[in-house]
């Protein structure tokens, strides 16, 4: 399945692909495009849009796209619920939601500065989410 979102990912646009690959669609292909092209590419490619305004898998109220994916795909795994709080705090204005959120935001911004290619950024940053998931499993 193809999934599409805005280019130059930050917290949610890396956390969501990690979540999708690990728990929803192991063969997922991610397309990163300019913001004004997301819906056109979604329609043309039959891709699922995420982390863009006015889509099912986007921000709703105080919750981020990571939360929307967990809800849609009924991912009730307790460590994922804990990780969702960390991601939400790092990706939204609720920076004090968890102690870990500010650190995740800083790490994610560092990855954006080091890696200019969006797909390489995903590949390099996924182990951070694997480690956070393990941490949340304790």
Roles of regions detected by a PLM:
Residues 71-138:
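A charged, amphipathic interaction segment
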Residues 12-13, 122:
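Active-site-proximal structural scaffolding
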């Amino acid at each position: 399945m193809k999934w599409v979102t805005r280019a130059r990912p930050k917290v949610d646009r890396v956390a969501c692909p990690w979540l999708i690959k690990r728990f929803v669609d192991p063969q997922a292909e991610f397309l990163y495009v300019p913001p004004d092209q997301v819906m056109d590419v979604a329609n043309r490619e039959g891709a699922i849009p995420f982390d863009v305004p006015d889509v099912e898998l986007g921000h709703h109220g105080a919750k981020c796209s990571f939360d929307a994916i967990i809800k849609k795909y009924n991912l009730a795994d307790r460590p994922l619920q804990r990780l969702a709080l960390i991601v939400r705090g790092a990706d939204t204005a609720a920076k004090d939601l968890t102690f870990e959120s500010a650190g995740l935001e800083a790490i994610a911004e560092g990855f954006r500065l080091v890696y200019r290619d969006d797909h390489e950024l995903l590949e390099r940053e996924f182990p951070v989410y694997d480690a956070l998931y393990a941490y949340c499993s304790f």
